[in-house]
């Protein structure tokens, strides 16, 4: 069963690189076999965090691992992990848009071409999640910077991701903080394009049903 990987794997034959941020945080990029030991961390964090608004996603660990292990073998995929000392506390993973497009339920590649955007030159950021206790340490920007550089070094000229937000939803927390200011600060803009995907979704009455969702597509050109 195909499912949409939510915003925010891994990867060519490169080993790992390390980029210090500020003590005690470090960003490391993993590819292919080097990424595999961290896939359970990624899968479980996705299940835990994406259960919350706005995704309300009911995850399955086996399905998560199957999808991550498949994506880990694709060309130019990369998993960037933020470490607090030696403990992983967040991640961002990227994949060429053309490799990821089968996860969408609508023809996103065709939509890009209609906008005169080149999907073959676009690197897609699938998920970014920071453990709640470690948010506010500039880790999101550092993770994006690391994988944007990785993508540019492999010839990609643009980057993209998707976001979902129900403006009025009974499960939306009163203190929910929109992330649009972060995306704009990273120089991404909404394209006006929409992607669609379906997943098991928590309902206000406590039930879980498979539901179709729409998401905004963001984009930017990568520059040195």
Positions of PLM-derived features:
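Conserved GNAT acetyl-CoA-binding A-motif
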Residues: 122-125, 151-175
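Active-site rim helix/loop that mediates acceptor-substrate recognition in acyltransferases
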Residues: 56-84, 93-96
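Conserved acyl-donor/pantetheine-binding loop and adjacent beta-alpha core of acyl/acetyltransferases
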Residues: 93-127, 196-209
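Helix-loop element at the rim of GNAT/NAT acetyltransferase active sites that forms part
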Residues: 43-59
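Conserved acetyl-CoA-binding loop-helix of GNAT-fold acetyltransferases
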Residues: 130, 136-152
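Glycine-rich phosphate/pyrophosphate-binding loop shared by adenosine-nucleotide-utilizing enzymes
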Residues: 25, 87-91, 123
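Conserved N-terminal entry element of GNAT/NAT acetyltransferase domains
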Residues: 8-9, 18-37, 44, 48, ...
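Conserved catalytic-core motifs of GNAT/GCN5-like acyltransferases
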Residues: 162-163, 171-204
């Amino acid at each position: 069963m195909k499912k949409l990987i939510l915003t925010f794997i891994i990867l060519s034959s490169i080993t790992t690189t390390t980029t210090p941020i500020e003590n005690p945080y470090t960003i490391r990029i993993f590819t292919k076999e080097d990424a595999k030991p961290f896939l359970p961390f990624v899968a479980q964090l996705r299940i835990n965090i994406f259960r919350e608004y706005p995704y309300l996603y009911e995850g399955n660990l086996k399905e998560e691992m199957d999808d991550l292990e498949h994506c880990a073998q694709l060309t130019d995929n990369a998993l960037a992990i933020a470490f607090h000392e030696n403990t992983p506390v967040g991640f961002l993973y990227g994949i060429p848009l053309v490799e990821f497009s089968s996860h969408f339920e609508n023809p996103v590649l065709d939509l890009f071409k209609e906008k005169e955007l080149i999907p073959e030159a676009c690197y897609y950021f699938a998920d970014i999640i920071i453990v709640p206790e470690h948010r506010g340490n500039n880790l999101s920007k550092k993770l994006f910077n690391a994988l944007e550089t990785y993508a540019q070094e492999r010839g990609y000229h643009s980057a993209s991701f998707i976001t979902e937000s129900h403006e009025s939803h009974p499960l939306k927390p009163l203190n929910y903080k929109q992330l649009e200011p972060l995306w704009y600060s990273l120089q991404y803009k909404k394209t006006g394009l929409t992607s669609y995907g379906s997943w098991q979704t928590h309902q206000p009455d406590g039930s879980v049903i498979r539901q179709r969702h729409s998401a905004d597509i963001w984009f930017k050109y990568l520059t040195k």
